[in-house]
Amino acid sequence: MEHYISLFVKAVFIENMALSFFLGMCTFLAVSKKVSPAFGLGIAVTFVLGIAVPVNQLIYANVLKENALIEGVDLSFLNFITFIGVIAGLVQILEMVLDKFMPSLYNALGIFLPLIAVNCAIFGGVSFMVQRDYNFPESIVYGFGSGLGWMLAIVALAGLTEKMKYADIPAGLKGLGITFISVGLMALGFMSFSGIQL
């Protein structure tokens, strides 16, 4: 159990997808203007990562990995296309569910919802799972931990952005300038977690 807690904390804080690896920055920067849509996108990314990583682990371990199906057959060259297909399918399901049951969030996310399918944080989570050779329970913990870490980062940035509306920011730094500085400072803050040994 301690191993899974350690993996979860590592995925959320120490190896945060947005602030340690800078993955998923397109949607991260674009949707971080208000807390409500940022939180909704964070939930969506957590959902997709939490399901895509374990599902792709099962597919990789039982079908694509060398000697998984038949002795001597290695289908790992199909990794990328298979992983992308699973991620795209999950995003389509998520898009239909949000359109049906949460139309306000669906409209607030706009074009960024289908862009989750090509969000490199999702693909990065799946790729790290393969690279680190996580088993199924580890992939569940890692997927949800990575998603929650990304959500924590985008909600924190959205909160900062909302507060900065009332600040006297120099004209040259308004918009993305101050956002990049804020993300850099947040990344430095999260870097302090790297010294934690679990």
Swiss-Prot record:
The keyword Translocase applies. It catalyses: a ubiquinone + n Na(+)(in) + NADH + H(+) = a ubiquinol + n Na(+)(out) + NAD(+). One of its GO terms (cellular component) is plasma membrane. GO terms for biological process: respiratory electron transport chain; sodium ion transport. Its main location: membrane. Its EC number is 7.2.1.1. It is found in: Cell inner membrane. It is a multi-pass membrane protein. InterPro entries: NqrDE/RnfAE, NqrDE/RnfAE_oxidrdctase, NqrE. The chain crosses the membrane at residues 11-31, 35-55, 77-97, 110-130, 140-160, 176-196. GO terms for molecular function: oxidoreductase activity, acting on NAD(P)H, quinone or similar compound as acceptor. Keywords: Cell inner membrane, Cell membrane, Ion transport, Membrane, NAD, Sodium, Sodium transport, Translocase, Transmembrane, Transmembrane helix, Transport, Ubiquinone. PANTHER family: INTEGRAL MEMBRANE PROTEIN OF SOXR-REDUCING COMPLEX, NA(+)-TRANSLOCATING NADH-QUINONE REDUCTASE SUBUNIT E. NQR complex catalyzes the reduction of ubiquinone-1 to ubiquinol by two successive reactions, coupled with the transport of Na(+) ions from the cytoplasm to the periplasm. NqrA to NqrE are probably involved in the second step, the conversion of ubisemiquinone to ubiquinol. Belongs to the NqrDE/RnfAE family. Composed of six subunits; NqrA, NqrB, NqrC, NqrD, NqrE and NqrF. This is Na(+)-translocating NADH-quinone reductase subunit E. It comes from Haemophilus influenzae (strain ATCC 51907 / DSM 11121 / KW20 / Rd).
